[in-house]
Amino acid sequence: MDVNRRIGVKDALLALLLALLQGCPLGETAPNASPLVGSNWGNPRRYVHLQTSTDMSNFYLEIRLDGTVRKSTARTSYSVILLKADTRERIAILGVKSNRYLCMDLEGSPFSSPTCIRDDCLFNHSLLENNRDVYYSSRTGILFNLEGSRQVFVVGQNVPQTSLFLPRTNTVPLERLLLHRDKRNQVVDPSDPHRVAVGRAEEGSDSRALQEDDADLEVETEVEVGDDGRNASRERLQAPSDHDPWGVFSSNPGSPRSSGTVG
């Protein structure tokens, strides 16, 4: 009798435990309130253009090869951005083509760096009620603004129009972003260091690749001329390393800072 009673108690406890588990699944967690931790954020395939606007036009954040941070009226290779989550609400903003991070100094002036400096290159992110994103320095709280004005972000306070951003889907073909990287990482044959034989064998395909790259530069030059009426800069083409895309292991990079005029 006692044995049957014990078995009955165990069965009742087991049934109660199963009911509790069904009501509160072990895998259930608090809802994720931050879009930065979503499956698309921080994914290398999730390239975007950060768009802001004035009453007259739309603009896009550009991070150039020479480190210049500026705005562009058109989507170009240098306006392709990767938002990389550091925490639920803190991100790094990487220019994919230039392989440089957006940063901000203590005065709120933007610059870029080939390495992610924690104090300067991490931004807090907030999604406002109007479905616009703002990015502000994790150290000073100063809003990133493509017009260059400086304001500390305060919840509920009016935000400058050019500090409000919309992530737009990337429209630049990936081969235009990765062309120089692929060329730089080609293995050199010791018996043909100047790649004469390879050049003859691939003359047709190589010339097509160069034409695509020239077209890419031509579009961006037209944007520069349209902004200020003259060619603002001439840049030396260089490529990031596939083995260290975040610049973590870069040794002695010199001064990582490269200031840029926003405008």
Swiss-Prot record:
The keyword tRNA processing does not apply. One of its GO terms (molecular function) is growth factor activity. Glycans are attached at N124, N231. It is found in: Secreted. The keyword Oxidoreductase does not apply. It comes from Tetraodon nigroviridis. Residues 198-211, 227-245 have a biased composition (Basic and acidic residues). GO terms for cellular component: extracellular region. Residues 212-226 have a biased composition (Acidic residues). Residues 1-23 form the signal peptide. Belongs to the heparin-binding growth factors family. Residues 198-263 are annotated as: Disordered. It comes from the Eukaryota. This is Fibroblast growth factor 23. Keywords: Disulfide bond, Glycoprotein, Growth factor, Secreted, Signal. Disulfide bonds join C103-C121. Residues 249-263 have a biased composition (Polar residues). SUPFAM superfamilies: Cytokine.
